């Protein structure tokens, strides 16, 4: 797979991921409740993706042989697809209970979701995003960004999950405790 094809697949993955996040947020929460932040694009995210493209372009120009490992690119593409599917299954399964912002106050529509993909992991949205994001870098054959994305995202989720679960335990009590004991978080080394 040529460097140009890798870059086009990367662009397509970004458009599909963010476009579908926005569409699903609008479908479950109404268009009035959806803002540009529903696209999940922050300054840090733009910086990370810009670094990834800079790495890809620099390596394609200076070390083009790094971009010729087609089997690595295909593994990355499979990761992108798997991550996207897991993430979207999480969103669709949770429906209105899935939000991009951690809720710190209980609301009547809150439900503990333990069926579907949530039977397999407590945080399929995070797991899917991690697989998707790292997959984009594997697909680009970006060694630096692959390692950086893995470490930064793991660190981010290792802090976000306990914070979110503090509130889930407040909202759902014993029911959440039992669920958490039976079902893994979905991310390695994060209980």
Swiss-Prot record:
Substrate binds at residue 160. GO terms for cellular component: endoplasmic reticulum; endoplasmic reticulum membrane. Divalent metal cations. Probably Zn(2+). It catalyses: [protein]-C-terminal S-[(2E,6E)-farnesyl]-L-cysteine + S-adenosyl-L-methionine = [protein]-C-terminal S-[(2E,6E)-farnesyl]-L-cysteine methyl ester + S-adenosyl-L-homocysteine. It is a multi-pass membrane protein. GO terms for biological process: methylation. Its EC number is 2.1.1.100. The chain crosses the membrane at residues 8-28, 45-65, 66-86, 129-149. Catalyzes the post-translational methylation of isoprenylated C-terminal cysteine residues. Carboxyl methylation is a reversible and potentially regulated step in the post-translational modification of prenylated proteins. Belongs to the class VI-like SAM-binding methyltransferase superfamily. Isoprenylcysteine carboxyl methyltransferase family. This is Probable protein-S-isoprenylcysteine O-methyltransferase. The lineage of its organism: Eukaryota, Viridiplantae, Streptophyta, Embryophyta, Tracheophyta. The gene is ICMT.
């Amino acid at each position: 797979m040529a460097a140009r094809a890798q870059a086009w697949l990367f662009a397509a993955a970004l458009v599909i991921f963010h476009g579908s996040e926005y569409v699903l947020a609008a479908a479950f929460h109404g268009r009035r409740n959806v803002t540009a932040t529903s696209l999940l694009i922050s300054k840090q995210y733009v910086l990370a993706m810009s670094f990834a493209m800079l790495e890809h372009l620099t390596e394609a120009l200076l070390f083009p042989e790094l971009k010729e490992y087609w089997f690595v690119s295909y593994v990355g593409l499979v990761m992108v697809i798997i991550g996207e599917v897991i993430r979207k299954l999480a969103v669709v399964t949770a429906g209105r209970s899935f939000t991009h912002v951690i809720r710190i106050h209980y609301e009547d529509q809150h439900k503990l979701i333990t069926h579907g993909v949530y039977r397999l992991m407590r945080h399929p949205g995070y797991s899917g995003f991690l697989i998707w994001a790292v997959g984009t870098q594997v697909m680009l054959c970006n060694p630096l960004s692959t390692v950086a994305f893995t470490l930064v995202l793991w660190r981010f989720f290792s802090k976000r999950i306990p914070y979110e679960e503090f509130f889930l335990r407040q909202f759902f009590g014993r029911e959440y405790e039992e669920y958490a004991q039976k079902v893994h978080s979905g991310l390695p080394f994060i209980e």
